Amino acid sequence: MWRLSGNWCGANWLCRRCDAALGLWRVFIVIVCVLGVVPAWAGDGADQTVSAPDFAVIEIKLTPTHQRAPISFTVKVAETERQRRHGLMFVSHLPERHGMLFVFESEAPRQFWMKNTQIPLDMLFFDSAGRLVNMIHAAVPFSLTRRNSNGSARYVLELNGGEAAKFDVQSDARLLLPLASQ
């Protein structure tokens, strides 16, 4: 239709309706633009790096078998729910003899997964006395498969994938913690 008298409809009696409709279209376009930009900017959070909580760093000892001397490891301690939930997510490199120690208030069956974890990990589950309950070798990065303790565990030690085999960790392995960490 030709635009007459500055109105889309061409009739003076529709002026107010046309102006109102154009105003609503402008508001609609602004809303669509904002809603289209915000999700692209915010994302769904799945691929975004979550700020890591602060972790205490301690030295622990692991006796791979009763016949061997203890081996020292430098570990970050995850003892709060937030720390345990974050764990080693988004870590792209873990130096040799470094890891994370998950500390729980009491023994219970434990499940871990590798969500947002970029490196393979060995998971060693220990009871309150530091005895090995179960060991998972080289858990696959990013896997949502649940890794079970297969018994009650109070501590879980995560190391680089392959380190448990490298240091010949056996079923009689013991975790030795500093007194303040127990």
Label each region the model flagged.
Residues 1-20:
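N-terminal secretory signal peptides that target proteins for export/translocation
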Residues 6, 30, 62-64:
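Intrinsically disordered/low-complexity terminal segments and short unstructured peptides
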Residues 25-37:
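Bacterial N-terminal signal peptides
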Residues 43-182:
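Compact, glycine-rich, soluble single-domain proteins
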